[in-house]
UniProtKB/Swiss-Prot annotation:
<keyword id="KW-0560">Oxidoreductase</keyword>
<dbReference type="GO" id="GO:0019592">
    <property type="term" value="P:mannitol catabolic process"/>
</dbReference>
<dbReference type="InterPro" id="IPR036291">
    <property type="entry name" value="NAD(P)-bd_dom_sf"/>
</dbReference>
<protein>
    <recommendedName>
        <fullName>Mannitol-1-phosphate 5-dehydrogenase</fullName>
        <ecNumber>1.1.1.17</ecNumber>
    </recommendedName>
</protein>
<dbReference type="Pfam" id="PF08125">
    <property type="entry name" value="Mannitol_dh_C"/>
</dbReference>
<dbReference type="GO" id="GO:0008926">
    <property type="term" value="F:mannitol-1-phosphate 5-dehydrogenase activity"/>
</dbReference>
<dbReference type="Pfam" id="PF01232">
    <property type="entry name" value="Mannitol_dh"/>
</dbReference>
<dbReference type="InterPro" id="IPR013118">
    <property type="entry name" value="Mannitol_DH_C"/>
</dbReference>
<keyword id="KW-0520">NAD</keyword>
<dbReference type="GO" id="GO:0005829">
    <property type="term" value="C:cytosol"/>
</dbReference>
<dbReference type="InterPro" id="IPR013328">
    <property type="entry name" value="6PGD_dom2"/>
</dbReference>
<dbReference type="InterPro" id="IPR000669">
    <property type="entry name" value="Mannitol_DH"/>
</dbReference>
<dbReference type="InterPro" id="IPR008927">
    <property type="entry name" value="6-PGluconate_DH-like_C_sf"/>
</dbReference>
<comment type="similarity">
    <text>Belongs to the mannitol dehydrogenase family.</text>
</comment>
<dbReference type="InterPro" id="IPR023028">
    <property type="entry name" value="Mannitol_1_phos_5_DH"/>
</dbReference>
<dbReference type="InterPro" id="IPR013131">
    <property type="entry name" value="Mannitol_DH_N"/>
</dbReference>
<feature type="binding site">
    <location>
        <begin position="3"/>
        <end position="14"/>
    </location>
    <ligand>
        <name>NAD(+)</name>
    </ligand>
</feature>
Length: 379
């Protein structure tokens, strides 16, 4: 079996590529990083270090690589033969790789289906990718490929911090991972992927991850920044921050249990597992890296505003701990982050109310805005 994977970064190698190799795919990575591409071409394997209570080393074999700018024809040929095409490139890059994928699909001479899975930190990633790919196909080509190409939405979760090693291919990952794939668009048989979880409806899993992993990680980062901690682990050793994060995840968890019928005890166990992941001593992640892009994270459908709004809609109360996280985000003034600089400028010109109205789409008189402003007074 053949898988073409766009993105040979840490997530691509340490998560997606690793599982595909374990599932007996020959994995062809596609990337723009010449150093990584050459190393994969020369070695044909790399090491993934799983850092938990004990450390395990996994050798990922049967891999190769192609350069996304210099080897377009070869990439197209591989897509034409592939059983699976996956991505881990970032949402903004999906439009840039869509034409290459379209050209590969056009060259397919077989009726054998191909599944395409965008493993991005976004809702409906594969749906979006299909829209971009379809823009490069005629109506006749679209019709011909519709019953041969399944674009499967998914949710992915594994913490892979920034890192450097003597061998540029080596990557350290946490033991926990979750790859949930929706089956609605499967054509023929469900793809064979060891460790993946296939479900009929992805939405509950997307929101569970967003409201727990992403919400919790952001809270640790913004609260940790206020107290001048450098790493996520240092911040989690602060009992006040630990309490704030745990309380916020109980608030977001209450929404999930109410909305999707998750078992309350099971969801509490999930929260505890997520908190333990943040404490993992082997996963050293910088506070400023996790806190980056605060304007995006202040969006109405993102990790802080969405659970806070849902809580208010469901229960008619303002979630105090989530509001505290939003307050900490608004105080994130790290000069090395362009969005943080822009956010502080907006607050300076339009006030907290103006910033929340502009980026979070919250009216200035909303009870959440009132609570956030109150929380900021004590930080």
């Amino acid at each position: 079996m053949l898988a073409v994977h766009f993105g040979a970064g840490n997530i691509g190698r340490g998560f997606i590529g690793s599982l595909l190799s374990q599932s007996r795919y020959n994995v062809v990575f596609v990337d723009v990083n010449e150093k990584i591409v050459q190393a994969l071409q020369q070695k044909g394997q790399y090491e993934v270090i799983i850092a938990g209570e004990t450390t395990q080393t996994q050798v990922v074999r049967n891999v190769s690589a192609l350069h996304s700018q210099h080897q377009q024809n070869e990439i197209i040929d591989q897509i034409a033969r592939a059983d699976l095409v996956t991505t881990a490139v970032g949402p903004n890059i999906l439009p840039l790789i869509s034409q290459t994928i379209a050209e590969g699909l056009k060259k397919r001479l077989t009726d054998r289906p191909v599944h395409i899975i965008a493993c991005e930190n976004m809702i409906g990633g594969s749906e979006h990718l299909k829209t971009y790919v379809w823009e490069h196909l005629s109506e006749q080509e679209q019709t011909s490929l519709e019953d041969k190409c399944g674009f499967l939405n998914c949710a992915v979760d594994r913490i892979v911090p920034n890192q450097t090693h003597e061998d540029p291919l080596t990557v350290v990952v946490e033991p926990f991972f979750e790859w949930v794939i929706e089956t609605k668009e499967v054509i023929g048989n469900i793809p064979h992927i060891i460790g993946a979880h296939f479900v009929d409806d992805l939405q509950p899993y997307i929101e569970r991850k967003l409201f727990t992993v992403n919400t919790g990680h952001a809270l640790v980062a913004y609260l940790g920044y206020r107290k001048k901690y450098e790493t996520i682990r240092q911040a989690m050793e602060d009992q006040d921050i630990l309490a704030d994060v745990t309380n916020a995840l109980r608030e977001s968890g209450r929404v999930l249990v109410h909305q999707y019928g998750w078992n309350e005890a099971e969801h509490q166990a999930y929260i505890e597992k997520i908190v333990q992941r943040f404490i993992n001593p082997s996963m050293t992640d910088e506070v400023t890296r996790v806190a980056r892009s605060p304007i995006r994270k202040l969006g109405p459908n993102d990790r802080l505003i969405r659970p806070a709004m849902k809580y208010y809609e469901c229960f008619g109360e303002v979630p105090a701990s989530l509001a505290k996280g939003i307050a900490a985000l608004l105080l994130f003034d790290y000069e090395g982050d362009a969005e943080a600089v822009q956010l502080q400028q907006t607050i300076k010109e339009s006030g907290v109310e103006g910033a929340l109205e502009k980026y979070a789409k919250l009216p200035s008189n909303h009870p959440i805005v009132v609570e956030v402003k109150k929380q900021m007074l004590y930080m």
